[in-house]
Amino acid sequence: MTMRARGGRWLAAAMAALAVASAAGCAYLDTKQREWIFRAQRDIHSTPASYGLPFEEVWLAVAGDADGARARVHGWWIPGPDATAPTLLYLHGARRNLSDNLFRIQRLHRMGFAVLAIDYRGFGRSDGELPSEAQAYEDAQAAWQQLRRLEPDPRRRFAYGHSLGGAVAIELATRNDDVAGLIVESTFTSMAEMADAMGYGNFPIGLVLTQHFDSLAKVRAVKAPVLFIHGTSDRFVPAEMSERLYAAAPEPKRLLLVESGNHSNVATMAFDKYQAAVRDFLALVRDRPARARASADRGG
């Protein structure tokens, strides 16, 4: 074998090893990002019955991982006070599953909503081990399909997202024209800007980020009215992020900033203001011109 041939074989082997190492490194980075972002919680310690709410268990089929197996997403359906109640898809944030979101779900039900709430894959009783951005979007879309079956009238279909769930809800609203109204609470502009806000600004996060959740780029495409809610003392997600999302969103839109509210207690601190903002928003949606509702009536 000539020196050139041996050199070529060595180079090919080195390139193959580099490709494997690079792929392994990318897979590791992706896994660690998903772990850091979602921090999925399994233990279900309470149900809607613990809060005096009637409910039904919901199981939704979604696409599985690369092996092609099907997976199931678990949720709760909490009927409204009457047949004309607005119906809301509840999308929670990171770290906490549905059982830790029941206080917020109960409050929305108290305001008159029927609620369909789901756990993303990896959370609660849903299948899967570690969710991804794409899978969270898929799970929300499957839940929206179920909401359509539960509520035939598109004028009464709403989506709500808290924190990370707000990013999922914004993506959902860009995919579906039949979202009558969107409520996002304590949410962020993008994962890259969240990394900056948490002190990683000197690290080239954009070069390695695999989970983007870029709501600031997407919110301009949302056709539904949007209500943004944020506490001014939120130490996890700066309220300024909701202000920027509000500025980027098309009309009609509303913004409620709750003085001294933190990441989770906005409605508790200022329930009257919170409820008034939600009711005003429902009236805004109800009173939209017929032409603006036409595409929603067709679905998406």
Segments predicted by a language model, with ranges:
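An N-terminal hydrophobic leader/cap segment in hydrolases
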Residues: 21-63, 292
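Membrane-embedded segments
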Residues: 67-146, 150, 155
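Short alpha-helix in the alpha/beta-hydrolase fold that links the catalytic acid
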Residues: 104, 215, 224, 238-247
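Hydrolase active-site cap/lid region
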Residues: 166-224, 268, 272
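Short beta-strand/loop motif that positions the catalytic acidic residue
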Residues: 221-223, 228-230, 234
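Acidic catalytic loop of the alpha/beta-hydrolase fold
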Residues: 232-237, 264-265
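Catalytic histidine neighborhood in serine/cysteine hydrolases
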Residues: 246-264
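Catalytic active-site module of serine/aspartate enzymes centered on a nucleophile-bearing elbow/loop
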Residues: 270-300
